[in-house]
Structure formats: structure tokens, C-alpha cells
């Protein structure tokens, strides 16, 4: 009997399953394509799409679980660490590093109707950050001196923008410069001075273990830079505020 089967059966192409790219990789590829930097102290909130921060939190929690297991910590039987990964992911994305992933708080400026041009200082403002080398805390205080221009912002807004800027991995020198840039953008003062005094736990908690050591740095711009007497007045006002708080 003659066979009626075809001499050859065409093969069927099977497309292999490919898992979706991790959300962190998709975000990085988008930033690279746009030429946007994502250094430790950069803010990337404008480049995150709806729902991506929640997806990133899930991914980070998974990576923290891997880290804990690599440190030979039993996260399955120890009730103290069962939910540590989720807590750490939440903490990084929404608290200690929120200045990277969340937009700047809404800060309105107002016309300087009275044409005020005398300097004033705001502080001490508590600042909390993390050393970008070891991701351990930087804790300290900040003072801001302003010689108003045509626009002014409320006193509490200085605290809000300082918290937003410092809530990222930093080195202190860069943090102060970024804060100065943001304040200048918000109210365009005639003069701006910022002083930060902070303790670095990369020196206090590890390494040389110097518990009393602190770092002090400042930035002066505009009239504070051009007029030495204004600069001296700012530092004197800071000293008076410190003395008042210590009594």
C-alpha cells in the first residue's frame, strides 16, 4: 500500500520563554538612553513611571534577602529577621534615601513685598544622610543664612528641602552644594550661606572609631561671598544660636 504521508513534516518553531527584565535594569536602561545621571546623590523621581517604585521595592527586598542569606543569617527560622528584607527595602526607598526616588516637596515662593534685605538665619535644622562609601549614617545640624531677593519662602520650607536633599547617599561636601543649588533655585536670594556640622558613623562606628569627631563645612554665595562682613555676621549668628540652645 502506498503511503499518503508527506515526505517531510515542517518543524514547528518554539519561542523560548524570556523572563521580564528586572525593574531596576529597565529604569537604568531608560536613564542611560536619556543621558541622565543616576549617581548616589542624584534624584531620579522624574524618570520613574507609575507603579515602578512599588516594583522596585519588591526587587530590593529580594536582593536584601539574598544578602542576608549570604551573611549566613537564617531568615526563615529567626522571627526577628523574617521581615527584615521588606523593612529594609521600605526604609531605603521611602525614608533614608527618599531624596533619590521621591519628588521635591511642593514649596511655594512669595514676592518680597516689603523689600527686606537684612540677613536672617534658620537653624539648627536636623539633617540625616548616609555615607555613600559605607551606607552608614551621617547625622548633624544645618544652618542657613539668607539675604532675601525678590522672592521669599517660609521658614519651615528650608527644613523640608534640607531633609529631601540629605535623604540620599552623600559625601557631606557635595550635599551642602546641592542644598545651596536648590535654595537658590527656589527663592533666588541676593546672598546665601550654609553651614553643616555632622558626625559620620563611618568614622564613629567603624574604621578608626573616633566617637567625638565631626565634620564642619560651609558654602557662601552671592553677597555673603562678596562682603566679608556679611559672612562674619552669619557665623556670629550661628554661634549665638548654638549658645542659646546650650543654656
Give, region by region, the residue ranges found by the protein language model.
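A domain-level signal for the structural core that forms small-molecule/cofactor-binding pockets
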Residues: 2-247
Amino acid at each position: 500500500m502506498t503511503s499518503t504521508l508527506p515526505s517531510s513534516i515542517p518543524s514547528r518553531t518554539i519561542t523560548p520563554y524570556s523572563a521580564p527584565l528586572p525593574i531596576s535594569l529597565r529604569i537604568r536602561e531608560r536613564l542611560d538612553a536619556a543621558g541622565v545621571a543616576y549617581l548616589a546623590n542624584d534624584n531620579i523621581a522624574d524618570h520613574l513611571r507609575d507603579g515602578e517604585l512599588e516594583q522596585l521595592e519588591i526587587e530590593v527586598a529580594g536582593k536584601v534577602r539574598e544578602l542576608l542569606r549570604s551573611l549566613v543569617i537564617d531568615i526563615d527560622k529567626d522571627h526577628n529577621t523574617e521581615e527584615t528584607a521588606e523593612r529594609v527595602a521600605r526604609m531605603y526607598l521611602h525614608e533614608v534615601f527618599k531624596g533619590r526616588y521621591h519628588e521635591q516637596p511642593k514649596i511655594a515662593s512669595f514676592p518680597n513685598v516689603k523689600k527686606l534685605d537684612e540677613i536672617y538665619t534658620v537653624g539648627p535644622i536636623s539633617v540625616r544622610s548616609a555615607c555613600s562609601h559605607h551606607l552608614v549614617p551621617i547625622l548633624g545640624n544645618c544652618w542657613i543664612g539668607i539675604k532675601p531677593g525678590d522672592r521669599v519662602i517660609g521658614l519651615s520650607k528650608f527644613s523640608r528641602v534640607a531633609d529631601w536633599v540629605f535623604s540620599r547617599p552623600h559625601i557631606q561636601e557635595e550635599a551642602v552644594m546641592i542644598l545651596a543649588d536648590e535654595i537658590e533655585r527656589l527663592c533666588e536670594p541676593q546672598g546665601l550661606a550654609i553651614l553643616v556640622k555632622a558626625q559620620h558613623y563611618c568614622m564613629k562606628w567603624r574604621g578608626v572609631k573616633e566617637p567625638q569627631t565631626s565634620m564642619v563645612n560651609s558654602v557662601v554665595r552671592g553677597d555673603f561671598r562678596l562682603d566679608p562682613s556679611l559672612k562674619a555676621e552669619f557665623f556670629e549668628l550661628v554661634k549665638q544660636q548654638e549658645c542659646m540652645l546650650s543654656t
